Structure formats: C-alpha cells, structure tokens
Amino acid sequence: MEPTTQTDPMTVTPKHELENGAAVAANDEEHPSKKQRLESISITEQEVSDGAPKRIKGVAPIKAEFLVQKSARSQPVEESALSLSADDAAEAAHYQEREGDQKGKKKASGQNKGRDFGRSEDAKGLCPSRAFSPEFSPKECKFGEKCRFEHDVRTYLKEHKREDLTTFGGICPIWDAKGRCPYGFKCRLVGSHMTERDTSDGRKELILLEDEERKKKARPVVPYASEDGLVNIVSNEDKIAVARRKTTTPRSDVYLAWLDKMSKALEKNLHGRHLEEGGADEGARAQTNDQVEENRAAYVEPPFLPSEKRRIYFGPETPTLAPLTTQGNLPFRRLCIDYGCQFTYSEMAMGMSLIQGQKSEWALMKAHESEALPPTISSTADVVQGYDNSKDFKFGAQIAGNKPWHAIKATELLSRLTPNLRVIDLNCGCPIDQVFREGAGSALLDHPSKLEKMLRGMNAVSEMIPITVKIRTGTRDNSPNATKLIERLVLGGHESGILNIGPPGVAAVTLHGRSRQQRYTKMADWSYIAECAALIKRLNEKKDDVTDTVREPDERMLPNGGKVFFLGNGDCYSHYDYDDHINNAGVDAVMVGRGAIIKPWVFEEIQAGQYLDKSATERLAMIEKYAKYGLDTWGSDEHGVGTTRRFMLEWLSFTYRYVPIGLLEYLPPHIQDRPPAWRGRNELETLLGSPNYKDWIKITEMFLGPAHKDFKFEPKHKSNAYEPQG
C-alpha cells in the first residue's frame, strides 16, 4: 500500500454535511483507492444546486448514476428494521432471544432462530497417529484394529479427504507463514508441504515438509507467546482443575466472606432491620456502629490496591475496538490491528461459565501476539504518572455476571491463568433479553449497589490487572441514569462512605450512548455522552467541588493516580465522527463497534485523518487476509475450513452494508443510513454489496473453495435469503 500523508485528525472538525466532490468512474473500470483527501465543499441543504437530491434521513444519499430502479433488494426502511437484531447479536449472540417470552409483543418474524450450520468433516478421518508421521513410520495407535479412523495415508488422501484447494496459489497459508502446518496430512492444501522420498528398499514414502527459514522468521515476537504466536492459552489440565473445583480462589473467598459480614452490618445500620417498630435505643445503634468498625478491622487488604495496579492510558490516538460477540473473534481482531486499532477486547464471557471451566468460554481469552504488543501512543501524550508503555498490552477481557461472586471469582481465575490481559472489563450494557432477565448485562444499571460491590471485589482480586466497566445511558429511554452511576463509580456510593473504604477503583468507564430499551433504533446520544464526559472531568480534576471532604476518596484507593478514563461508544463510522467526538464530546477515546465490522479500515481512516475510498479489489484482498487468519486460528483441515467459512459469512452479513463513499452524494456517511438499490462501479463492487447470502457464499468460495456438501448457512434475517430475479 502506498504511503499516506499523515494529517492530525484532531485539527479540524467539519461543522456541516459535505457534498462529495470526489471523481467517480462511471464505467466498469476499477476505481483506485483514494489516498489523497477527498475535496469537499461545505454546503447546507438550501444551497444544493444542479438538481442534486436533498439528503433524506435514514437513506444513504447515493448518486443518481448508481441507482437501480428495479431490484430484489430490500427497501431501506425494511432492511434497517431487520438489521437491528443482528446489531444486538453482535453484543451477545450466544444468548438468543427465547421464544414465547415476548408477552403482548409482536414477534420479530424476520429472524431465523436456532440456525443450523451443518457439518464440515472428512468422509472418514485420519488417525492422529498417522496425521504427522512419515508414511512408513507412524506412531502406535492405542486403539489398534478397533480404531474407527483410517490408518493408510494414501487411502485417506484418495478416498476420504476432499481434493486440495487451489486458492492461495495452492500454498497452505499457515505453512507459508510459519514453515510448518500443524494439521499435517489433513490440511486442505497438504500438496504444498508434502512430498515423496525414495526409501532404501525402493519404495516411495509420503512425508511432510518443514521450512527452517520460515520457522525462524515466524518465531513469536513476545516471549510468553506459544509457538503458534498466541497468548493467554489455558491448558486442558487447568480447565479440568477449574471444572472439578480443584483450583482454589483464596483471595475471592476472603473478600466474599468480608463482603457478606459487611453487607449484613450495613443492612442493620442503614435500614434499622434489627430494630423493633417502636424505635431504636442509642445502645443498639452504638452496638451496630461497633459492628461496622469491627468489620473494618477484619477486612484484609488485597495484594494490590487500585493505585498499585498497572497504569493504563487512553487517548485520541488510541481508537478502540468494542467487545463484539461472534464478530469480535481472533481473526477479525488481527485484521483491525493491521488497520491501526490500538485496543481490542475478547468476546463477552460469562463469569459462571469461566468458573465452571467451560472450554468454549476460556477459548475466548486467546489472543494473537500482535494484541500482546504495547499500543502506539503519541510522544506528547498526557499519560498518567507511572504509566509504562513497554508493559502495556492491546488486549483485554470482558466478562458478565449477575452475582458478585460470579464476577469476583472469574476475575481471580483470569488474573491467575491469563495474566497477559490489559484490563478486565465488566459488561453492564448487553441488551439481550435473556441476559437481562438473568440480572446480568444492562440489568446491573438498575442495581448500582450490587454493581459497585462487583467492581470493588474484582479490583480486590485482580492483582496487577486494572478493572474497567462498560455501561449504557440506562435501561429506559426516558430515564437515563448514567450520570448518577458514573459519580458512584468514581467516588463510591453512600455505603462506601460510611465504611470509609473509598471508591470501587475503576480505571476507565465506557458509555454506549443508547438505552437498553432503545437498542439500535435511534442514533447514539452523543450530547449525553458529552455531559458525562464533563462530569468525569470535574470528578477527576475538582473532586472537592462535587463532594464534601467526608466522601473525598482516599488517594491509596484511586487507580491511575486518580484519573478515571472515559470512552464514548456509538455510531462511529469515519474519521469525521471520531474527530467530532474527541473534540466536541470531550471523551478520552472512542470505542468503535459496528462501524469496524462494516469497514475495518475505519481505524486507518482515523489514523490518516481522511476518507479512504477502498476499491473492490482492495476490499477483496482484505477478505482474503481474513480467510488466512481464519485458517491459522481454526485450522486448515476440513473442519477448520468450514469454521472459517461460517464466521466469514457472519462477517459478510455486515460488510455488505458498506456503500463506497465514491458513490455517495454527501459526506459524512451515516452508519444508520440504508441504501436504495444500487450498483457498484464494477461487477465485483456490486457483488460485495449484495444482500443475498448466496452471493456471500460465492465470495467465501473464492478463497475456501466449494462448500462441503453438509455445510449449511442460514442468514440471521429471512430478508437476505431470496432467489435472484431476472
């Protein structure tokens, strides 16, 4: 990619919508990616000339020459409505809405529920004892003749394994990058790292090849990464020990015992539940106060107070990828890192599932070594005292829970088994009904006391890992409570003031500018985010202006030397949005969610400070890179190819929403806008914008070959599953 002239994205914030004056190819020739700043003219709707249509709210303003009059595409409003559950699912796709629980409400009949992805397996598998050994010197199979897998390598390759893929130039991308393929003869591109050699008895033996030079270049860049370049890998022995309750959580046990005693004492002291209805005598009150003091004395300080934890930093130059369920998988995060994303998070993991040792939940903690590197920050960044960039990471974990002990014990296990985490974030924003009904996610917004207990306990057991929290404006549209909640998160609630135990010690707060009720039906409320940013700034700089000296936090209990970072989240879709939020909302950084799924190069735009009109060829190369990362993560055997195809299709169900900016009449683009039927500047661009899931499968086959006969894919929405019409 040719170099881009770097422009400080914080210098100018456009105040008006702009008419897109970019030159656009009107024929079918490929439109090159624009690396120069798109020339734009500030106008108002009244100043529109030359018959250009006015911008209609909710509809992408596509230039007339790219509009298609008749198409099987869904209309903008319909497509917008049906895409809402997909956006919700990006926050918690593992917890689908339960049927029959929506009493008095209209069912979302456009959704495909209980989707089946079929299977992608060999007709008969190759025995593991043969998968990596030379043909004539295999390892011993412990099952012998009773083994249900194939033992003859040539028979397996000829009869049970599908033919090799011809994509990627016929070369296995894992072997090409690392000099060895961990899938041996089962690899769908095994021909690139397999050969025959002559033996002393005149036979020809199949063997696997390794490239020492490639292996040397592929050595991990961080010392604690695995041979495959992964960090935070939890061994099977550790997961089994957790599942069988053989792994103890001593810090959590001590803290939870103290919390239980403290809660009972506070309940008596604050609510007088130990008193009879006739009133209370002074002796009883004094006894209760003595009990509170006794609990204070019994409290054992955690090994690391918040002020003793690793310092972190968020700034304008650190755009952050939001935690995304399903979409936020490891290959996608790697892709975003390549485009300039500075911080990533795991998919949301349920605390109880981690405590139970569920393999699928612990697998979410795996990160690529590129996520274990320090973030790139400005040399003039206003970092907090004690911040050491060389000890910082890009990857953090997000967990959810409905009880304090779930979150606290899960945090202690994470800090012990996956120490290479930047932060552990508590999800208080997930809107999915099942998560909400269980009391987790956004349900915690209505229970601030419980939330504070969870965060305080997480801080007590997380060792050096800072604790952060992600919230919404509230659970209902007409009653936002984020300002009150933020004050509690920074200063501590009334109970903490009585016990004189300081604030809960969160290092950062992220606010999604929507309520739980709102979901994605309206634009994020950045004016409210700005109000909360101003509040946090006041709390950080002038705590004595908003509280009395009795509630002034103990300096020992403050994370980051007393600074709580604040991130805004919602509808960031371009460098224009990012700059506007940094300059006008006053947030430290912006967390990008759907905007990054639809166009991962939004991080590159933020870094360059300009729109980038990616050509269809460049976007296809991006999808190819995702395919390579997918095979590296899930495997290059039949099962791994099928898994990569499934997650690529899930991703393409978002990327098709992208309308190239060269086709737009006005800038900036809005993430909520849905386009009328349109055609691209060439056939490939049109294909990439197709809402038909069969076209998405066609795109995956460009890199992963024809789908397995048993593979299935049902799009999230029935509106995407139509037959092409002539």
Curated annotation (Swiss-Prot):
GO biological process: mRNA processing
CC annotations in GO: cytoplasm; nuclear periphery
Enzyme Commission no: 1.3.1.89, 1.3.1.-
UniProt xrefs under Pfam families: Dus
Keywords: Cytoplasm, Flavoprotein, FMN, Metal-binding, mRNA processing, NAD, NADP, Nucleus, Oxidoreductase, Repeat, tRNA processing, Zinc, Zinc-finger
Positions annotated as active site in the UniProt record: 430
Cofactors: FMN
Biased composition (Polar residues): 1-10
Composition skew (Basic and acidic residues), residue ranges: 28-38, 94-103, 113-124
Annotated compartments: Cytoplasm; Nucleus
Domain of life of the source: Eukaryota
The keyword RNA-binding appears for this protein: no
Catalytic reaction annotation: 5,6-dihydrouridine(47) in tRNA + NAD(+) = uridine(47) in tRNA + NADH + H(+); 5,6-dihydrouridine(47) in tRNA + NADP(+) = uridine(47) in tRNA + NADPH + H(+); a 5,6-dihydrouridine in mRNA + NAD(+) = a uridine in mRNA + NADH + H(+); a 5,6-dihydrouridine in mRNA + NADP(+) = a uridine in mRNA + NADPH + H(+)
Region described as Disordered: 1-55, 68-124
Residues bound to FMN: 323-325, 398, 470, 512, 569-571, 593-594
Function: Catalyzes the synthesis of dihydrouridine, a modified base found in the D-loop of most tRNAs. Specifically modifies U47 in cytoplasmic tRNAs. Catalyzes the synthesis of dihydrouridine in some mRNAs, thereby affecting their translation.
Protein name, UniProt field: tRNA-dihydrouridine(47) synthase [NAD(P)(+)]
